[in-house]
Amino acid sequence: MAESKVVVPESVLKKIKRQEEWALAKKDEAVAAKKKSVEARKLIFKRAEQYAKEYAEKDNELIRLKREAKLKGGFYVDPEAKLLFIIRIRGINAIDPKTKKILQLLRLRQIFNGVFLKVNKATVNMLRRVEPYVTYGYPNLKSVKELIYKRGYGKLNHQRIALTDNSIVDQALGKHGIICVEDLIHEIMTVGPHFKEANNFLWPFQLKAPLGGLKKKRNHYVEGGDAGNRENFINELVRRMN
């Protein structure tokens, strides 16, 4: 007796074919994703090396200029700062509506919130208005790095996301050529062409109360208090609050 031939319905054959095609596509996708990941890691490493070299060259140039000025019997004057870090040091008691509005515009809604700010006429005018409620100064590379690595959160799809992975930065800022945390640090530190986008991506930093406390929050820094411009000494305060 001849064996009966099993006829597989066409719909089943089509389904099997679709599954095979899907599996092949997923495999190709995985290979492409792995290749892209390897290339991205190489690029990130290369950029990190490039930035380290750039920062070192800048430091060496600064040392050279200071030595040169000293040899000539003068002193070196730092170029005008482009970047500020502002920390809110007072609450809402007895605060007038205009000052409150400016603090909100600066994204300093809570005490010990901190934000980066580009120096220009508009920001300087705003800072003058809210000076009794904030302290600020010129952050160095160490401060910018430590703030972003230790307390950095980004805004992605209206969510506050910890910067635990370069892919978070890439998703939000990749279209601006900022694909990793080191790119983000460089854009902030150098006040680059996409500083606004990079800074808006960063959630305001929530710092802790400073070790040793604050002296006199109502008095200006130059009067022995805490408010206002403390120039390079902001970095010492960042260490105490980070």
Swiss-Prot record:
Q: What's one Pfam family here?
A: Ribosomal_L30_N
> Record's Gene3D superfamilies?
Ribosomal protein L30, ferredoxin-like fold domain
Output a single Gene Ontology CC term carried by this record.
Answer: ribosome
In terms of InterPro entries, this protein maps to: Ribo_uL30_ferredoxin-like_sf (IPR036919), Ribosomal_uL30 (IPR039699), Ribosomal_uL30_CS (IPR018038), Ribosomal_uL30_euk (IPR005998), Ribosomal_uL30_euk_arc (IPR035808), Ribosomal_uL30_ferredoxin-like (IPR016082), Ribosomal_uL30_N_euk (IPR012988)
Q: Ribosomal protein as a keyword?
A: yes
Q: Which UniProt keywords apply?
A: Ribonucleoprotein, Ribosomal protein
A single GO molecular function term of this UniProt record: structural constituent of ribosome
Keyword flag Iron-sulfur: no
GO terms (BP aspect) = maturation of LSU-rRNA from tricistronic rRNA transcript (SSU-rRNA, 5.8S rRNA, LSU-rRNA)
Query: Which family is this protein grouped under?
Result: Belongs to the universal ribosomal protein uL30 family.
List the protein's name.
Large ribosomal subunit protein uL30x
